[in-house]
A protein has these predicted regions:
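Short, charged, amphipathic alpha-helix that recurs within catalytic cores of restriction-modification
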Residues: 83-115
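Short connector loops at helix/strand junctions that flank enzyme active sites
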Residues: 62-64, 73-77, 108-110
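Short acidic/glycine-enriched loop/turn segments that link adjacent beta-strands
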Residues: 60-63, 121-122
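Conserved catalytic cores of phosphodiester-cleaving nucleases, focusing on short active-site segments
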Residues: 44, 67-84
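A short beta-strand motif that forms the metal-chelation/ATP-contact edge
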Residues: 66-69, 125-127
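Acidic-basic catalytic patches of nuclease active cores, encompassing PD-(D/E)XK
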Residues: 1-56
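Short active-site-proximal "capping" loops at secondary-structure junctions
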Residues: 57-61, 83-84
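Domain-level recognition of nuclease-like catalytic cores that cleave nucleotide substrates
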Residues: 2-8, 27-32, 107, 111-148
Length: 148
């Protein structure tokens, strides 16, 4: 038995649901998300926030948001998703990473984990009050971010 045999047998094959994307399709989808993140940073800066996009090329075990912003005694951590559909799903693990990221910043009085959904003609923001799965639809109204 060789090391290759051991390596091949340790990981069971996962059953992928749906169709496999080509590299061009995958790149286009990621670029659509990156544009939404950059757009959000511009919007936050226009409202007086100090905002930055955290460019992470692959899913990470580190608790990093897509975008974070500060203003006064408040820090916001955003998970950003964009779609051409009418709903966006946020997994519990993504919300947990936002909460873990915010817990590192003890100096801020207000800390908010915010789920941001960019639809074709509208942004929707939802404050994640607890670690759970969330769905944002395009007919929802945004949560109040800083004053709540």
């Amino acid at each position: 038995m060789s090391l290759r045999d051991i390596a091949e047998k340790t990981k069971p094959k996962s059953k992928r649901r749906g169709r496999k994307l080509s590299s061009n399709e995958s790149r286009r989808i990621r670029a659509y998300g990156h544009r939404a993140e950059r757009d959000l940073v511009k919007k936050l800066r226009a409202k007086g926030f100090k905002a930055v996009r955290v460019p992470v090329s692959a899913p990470s075990s580190e608790p990093l948001p897509d975008v974070f912003a500060t203003k006064g005694g408040c820090i916001l951590a955003f998970e950003v998703k964009s779609t051409r559909s009418d709903r966006i799903y946020f997994k519990q693990e993504q919300v947990k990473k936002l909460v873990e990221f915010l817990s590192m910043f003890e100096v801020y009085d207000k800390k908010k984990a915010v789920l941001a959904g960019k639809f074709p003609y509208k942004w929707v923001f939802k404050v994640a009050d607890k670690i759970d799965n969330y769905i944002i639809t395009d007919n929802e109204e945004s949560s109040e971010l800083v004053n709540s």
